[in-house]
């Protein structure tokens, strides 16, 4: 475990992990595990999975309580602007998480330490680890320092959520089921591209490509809106 990380978390956020193995896991990339199999390490992908869900509900609850008069669509748009690659990667860098992630030599050489999708995953993994170690109150306390002040300052109000815009456009005259289908994952692990179609029934409305599924879905929704409004 990096003593500097432990010290910085304590000094900046008042966080002290009970189970340092969880913190260690959160900052261990799969490329590092693959290059050090003899150590029997675990990468942060499972914690990322958990942290993604924890962040979704934490931000959702905050917005629901803070804006009691807002309609669902407006809440969804703001949440999508917060719970996304651009924002999470920014939070990761502000917290200096990029300094402590353990990477394999190949990923380090390819500039992964500055890659937005990796930093997003790292932020989610950290919150997943914090949730397991101390519960959701600890996550809320951390997010109250890192994210909530930015919401109150209006930093996310100008970001566009194309998925919600597409949903509202298509559902003007009633409920319509919209489906996003992953077509392919192409490229090496350090430069993976996801291809997604957005459909209503069997009709493909648009296709998109992105560095993760969320970004690809947004790109597909944007393309669908452009074609529907043409």
Curated annotation (Swiss-Prot):
Its EC number is 3.1.26.3. Belongs to the ribonuclease III family. It is an enzyme of class 3 (hydrolase). The active site is at residues 52, 124. Keywords: Cytoplasm, Endonuclease, Hydrolase, Magnesium, Metal-binding, mRNA processing, Nuclease, RNA-binding, rRNA processing, rRNA-binding, tRNA processing. SUPFAM superfamilies: dsRNA-binding domain-like, RNase III domain-like. The keyword Cytoplasm applies. It catalyses: Endonucleolytic cleavage to 5'-phosphomonoester. The keyword Amino-acid biosynthesis does not apply. GO terms for cellular component: cytoplasm. Its cofactor is Mg(2+). One of its GO terms (biological process) is tRNA processing. Residues 6-135 form the RNase III domain. It is found in: Cytoplasm. Its main location: cytoplasm. Residues 161-230 form the DRBM domain. This is Ribonuclease 3. Pfam families: dsrm, Ribonucleas_3_3. Coiled coil: none annotated. Digests double-stranded RNA. Involved in the processing of primary rRNA transcript to yield the immediate precursors to the large and small rRNAs (23S and 16S). Processes some mRNAs, and tRNAs when they are encoded in the rRNA operon. Processes pre-crRNA and tracrRNA of type II CRISPR loci if present in the organism. The gene is rnc.
């Amino acid at each position: 475990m990096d003593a500097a990380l432990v010290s910085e978390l304590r000094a900046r956020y008042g966080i002290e992990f009970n189970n340092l193995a969880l913190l260690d896991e959160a900052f261990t990339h799969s490329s590092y595990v693959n290059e050090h199999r003899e150590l029997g390490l675990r990468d942060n992908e499972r914690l990322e999975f958990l942290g993604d869900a924890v962040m979704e509900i934490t931000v959702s609850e905050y917005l629901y309580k803070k804006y009691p008069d807002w309609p669902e669509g407006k809440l969804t748009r703001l949440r999508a602007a917060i719970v996304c690659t651009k924002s999470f990667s920014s939070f990761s860098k502000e917290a200096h998480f990029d300094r402590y992630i353990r990477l394999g030599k190949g990923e380090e050489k390819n500039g992964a330490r500055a890659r937005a999708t990796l930093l997003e995953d790292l932020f989610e993994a950290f919150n997943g680890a914090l949730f397991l170690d101390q519960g959701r109150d600890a996550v809320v306390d951390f997010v109250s320092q890192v994210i909530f002040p930015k919401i109150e300052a209006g930093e996310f109000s100008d970001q566009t959520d194309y998925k919600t815009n597409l949903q509202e456009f298509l559902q003007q005259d009633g409920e319509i089921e919209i489906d996003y289908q992953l077509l392919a994952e192409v490229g090496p692990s350090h430069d993976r591209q996801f291809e997604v179609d957005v459909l209503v029934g069997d009709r493909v409305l648009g296709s998109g490509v992105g560095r993760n599924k969320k970004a690809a879905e947004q790109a597909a929704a944007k393309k669908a809106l452009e074609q529907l409004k043409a």
